[in-house]
Design a protein with these regions (language model features):
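Generic detection of long, well-ordered alpha-helical segments
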Residues: 1-4, 90, 139, 143, ...
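Low-complexity, intrinsically disordered regions enriched in charged/polar residues
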Residues: 1-4, 39, 129, 143, ...
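Gly/Gly-Pro- and Ser/Thr-rich, intrinsically disordered tail segments characteristic of DNA damage-repair
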Residues: 1-121, 126
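Basic, nucleic-acid-binding surfaces and adjacent catalytic neighborhoods in DNA/RNA-processing proteins
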Residues: 22-44, 58, 152-276
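A generic structural signal for well-ordered coil/turn residues at beta-strand boundaries
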Residues: 60-62, 94-96, 131, 247, ...
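Intrinsic-disorder/low-complexity coil detector
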Residues: 66, 86, 92, 138, ...
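Phosphate/anion-contacting hairpin/loop surfaces
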Residues: 73-176, 181-188
Length: 276
């Protein structure tokens, strides 16, 4: 699944590559997929996108906003798979779930490997969409300060019991983060995924906050994770410290063997000595 660093990369590349191109034809999926969420029929999507120009893209959390001007915004979110630019539309993949063919002969395609939203809104209405409307600050927002982070933890603790992994990956409490990047955040913060959020002292809260910022910045600076591809089909440069290849290997910090556990619906890789 794309997380914040990959979407920041895709937005930047879209602005370098797509801005100003005029849509000749808009197409929805050529292969049915019950977990792709559309809000337009095939006919509506084609009619409303034809003749519109690509504007400046932006991202928030795990959502990508691509203006089709005048008047509309293409919203892609909560998905993994690929978003690819094709210099010629003769190179379109065999399967796609959305395509924009441009007047200059190039194209953009989106394909999801799991699930995702591919929706077209009248400009401004995309901000009313569920999961976008009430989105909290993300780690790249100026409002994501340590003061805000402390308040977020205190707010979360008034509800159900949470763990550190739960804070990072559940209910988009910190938009843009997912299970992949959370592994390295917890390693940098020296915290076990099951660590009770209520038990964090001030020093641990600070360490977790700083680990979020450091990990997200590192992944953005390197164009996203190396197990995801960018707009041009190239893998990102960020190699995770804690992923499936780390299991059974020595911890890079203390040499203890890295272990794998299943927790909160996904695999976790951790150092049983460093992360408590």
């Amino acid at each position: 699944m794309f997380e914040l660093p990959e979407l920041v990369t895709l937005a930047a590349q879209a602005n370098e590559t797509l801005v100003g191109r005029t849509v000749r034809e808009g197409l929805l999926g050529n292969r049915p997929h019950k977990f792709v969420w559309y809000n337009r029929t095939t006919e509506e999507f084609g009619r409303l996108t034809a003749g519109r120009r690509v504007g400046q893209a932006s991202t928030r959390g795990r959502w990508l906003f691509i203006p089709l001007e005048p008047g509309y915004v293409l919203l892609l979110g909560e998905f993994g798979g690929s978003l690819l630019f094709h210099p010629t539309d003769e190179t379109l993949p065999e399967i796609y779930h959305l395509a924009l063919r441009f007047e200059d002969g190039s194209a953009l395609t989106a394909r999801t490997a799991m699930w995702g939203a591919m929706e077209l809104y009248e400009a401004g209405r995309e901000q009313e969409r569920e999961l976008v409307r009430d989105m909290r600050p993300t780690p790249v927002d100026s409002s994501f300060t340590f003061k805000y982070f402390r308040g977020l933890i205190d707010e979360v603790l008034t509800g159900k019991k949470r763990s550190v992994k739960g804070l990072l990956t559940q209910d988009q409490l910190i938009p843009g983060l997912g299970n992949a990047i959370a592994q390295d955040i917890m390693f940098r913060a020296r915290l076990h995924p099951r660590h009770d959020l209520a038990a964090l002292d001030e020093e641990q809260r600070r360490a977790l906050y700083e680990a979020i910022g450091a990990t997200v910045r590192a992944a953005i600076d390197q164009g996203g994770r190396n197990d995801e591809v960018d707009l041009h089909g190239q893998p990102g440069g960020y190699a995770r410290i804690m992923d499936r290849s780390a299991a059974g290997q020595p911890c890079p910090r203390c040499s203890t063997t890295i272990v794998k556990i299943q927790y909160l619906g996904g695999a976790c890789y951790l150092c049983p000595a460093c992360q408590t």
